[in-house]
C-alpha cells in the first residue's frame, strides 16, 4: 500500500472478510504483519537469533476469529535494538526493527570522517578546534568556511555513493574539546554552549540539501538545546541519556531529571527528536540486568513526549 498519514510506513492490517484473510501493509508492513500472524494466531515464538531459538507449533487445524480485525502502526518511525541479535534479519523482521546501515549513509560521530585528522591536521590545523590554547584534532572548527565547504563536498560525494540512504549524520566526535576560537565563541556564548556552533553549522549544511534528512547528536558538550537557534526541519536531533542510571524508568529516576529537562528543551527547538538510550548498567557490563520492568514505561514516556526514533544500545 502507499504510505499515507493514516497508513504510515511499516503499518499493516489483518482482517477476516468472509472466508478470506486480508493482510495489507505499507513499507515492510506486509512482512511485519505476516510475523504478527505467526505470533498471535499460530502461536510462534522467537526468543533470540537463530532457528534453534524459534518455535512454531505443529497443528493439523487452525482457528481464526471470524471478526478478526488488527491494525498496527509503529510507535516510532525508527526502531533499533543494538545487540548482536540484529545480525539475524529474521529476528529484526519478526519484531519490526531497523538496522542503522539500512537507513544511514553516515551514522553517529562523523567529524573525523568528514575531515580525517590523519590527512588534514598537519597541513590545515585551522580546520580543527582551538582548545587549551592550541589547535587540536578533537573536534572541528565549525565557524571555518573551508570546513563548511569540505563538508558540503563530502556529503555530495557520499550521497552519490549511497543514493538509497535516508539519513546523514553531522555530529561531533565522541569526545570533548569543542572549538574556543573567537568566531565559535561568539555563537556559543549567545546560545549557551558548543551546541550553538554545532546547530548553526548543521543548519547551514542542511540548507544546501533541502530534500535530504540529516541527524546530529545532543551528547556531552552539545547535550543542551541552544538558547535561541531552532533546528532546521530536515534535521533530527538524537539526544543521549547516557548519564541516567538504569535502576528505575526515566520518568521517575532522579538521575534522569537532566535528561527530561533536555528533552523538553530540544522539543521546543526541533521538529524531529530521536533518543539514544542504553540497555546496560555501566557499573558492571557483565552482570545480569533485567529491563522488562522499566523499559516499557520509559518507551511510553518517550512516545508521549513526541520522540520519533529510538536507538537502544546494549
Report the location of each language-model feature.
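Substrate-binding cleft/loops of secretory-pathway carbohydrate-active enzymes
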Residues: 215-243, 286-294
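Active-site-proximal structural scaffolding
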Residues: 74, 144, 198, 202, ...
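Generic recognition of flexible, low-complexity loop/linker segments
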Residues: 157-158, 224-226, 262-264, 297-300
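Glycoside hydrolase catalytic-domain groove-lining segments
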Residues: 225-233, 241-281
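Feature activates predominantly on carbohydrate-active enzymes
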Residues: 5-200, 204-211, 215, 236-238, ...
Amino acid at each position: 500500500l502507499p504510505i499515507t498519514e493514516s497508513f504510515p510506513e511499516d503499518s499493516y492490517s489483518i482482517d477476516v472478510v468472509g472466508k478470506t484473510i486480508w493482510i495489507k501493509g505499507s513499507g515492510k508492513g506486509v512482512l511485519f504483519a505476516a510475523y504478527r500472524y505467526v505470533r498471535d494466531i499460530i502461536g510462534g515464538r522467537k526468543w533470540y537469533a537463530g532457528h534453534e531459538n524459534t518455535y512454531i507449533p505443529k497443528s493439523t487445524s487452525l482457528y481464526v476469529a471470524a471478526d478478526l480485525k488488527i491494525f498496527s502502526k509503529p510507535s516510532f518511525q525508527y526502531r533499533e535494538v543494538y545487540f548482536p541479535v540484529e545480525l539475524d534479519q529474521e529476528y529484526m523482521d519478526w519484531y519490526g526493527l531497523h538496522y542503522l546501515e539500512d537507513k544511514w549513509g553516515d551514522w553517529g560521530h562523523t567529524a573525523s570522517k568528514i575531515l580525517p585528522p590523519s590527512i588534514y591536521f598537519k597541513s590545515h590545523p585551522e580546520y580543527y578546534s582551538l582548545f587549551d590554547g592550541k589547535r587540536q584534532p578533537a573536534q572541528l572548527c565549525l565557524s571555518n568556511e573551508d570546513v563548511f565547504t569540505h563538508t558540503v563536498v563530502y556529503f555530495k560525494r557520499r550521497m552519490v555513493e549511497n543514493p538509497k540512504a535516508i539519513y546523514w549524520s553531522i555530529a561531533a566526535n565522541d569526545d570533548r574539546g569543542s572549538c574556543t576560537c573567537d568566531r565559535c565563541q561568539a555563537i556559543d556564548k549567545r546560545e549557551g554552549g558548543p551546541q550553538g556552533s554545532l546547530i548553526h553549522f548543521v543548519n547551514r549544511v542542511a540548507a544546501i540539501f533541502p530534500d535530504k534528512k540529516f541527524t546530529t547528536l545532543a551528547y556531552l558538550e552539545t547535550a543542551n538545546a541552544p538558547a535561541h537557534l531552532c533546528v532546521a526541519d530536515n534535521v533530527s536531533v538524537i539526544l543521549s541519556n547516557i548519564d541516567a542510571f538504569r535502576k528505575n524508568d526515566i520518568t521517575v529516576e532522579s538521575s534522569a531529571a537532566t535528561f527530561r529537562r533536555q528533552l523538553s528543551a530540544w522539543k521546543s527547538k526541533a521538529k524531529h527528536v530521536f533518543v539514544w538510550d542504553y540497555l546496560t548498567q555501566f557499573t558492571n557490563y557483565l552482570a545480569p540486568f533485567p529491563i522488562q520492568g522499566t523499559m516499557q514505561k520509559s518507551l511510553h514516556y518517550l512516545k508521549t513526549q513526541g520522540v520519533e526514533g529510538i536507538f537502544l544500545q546494549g
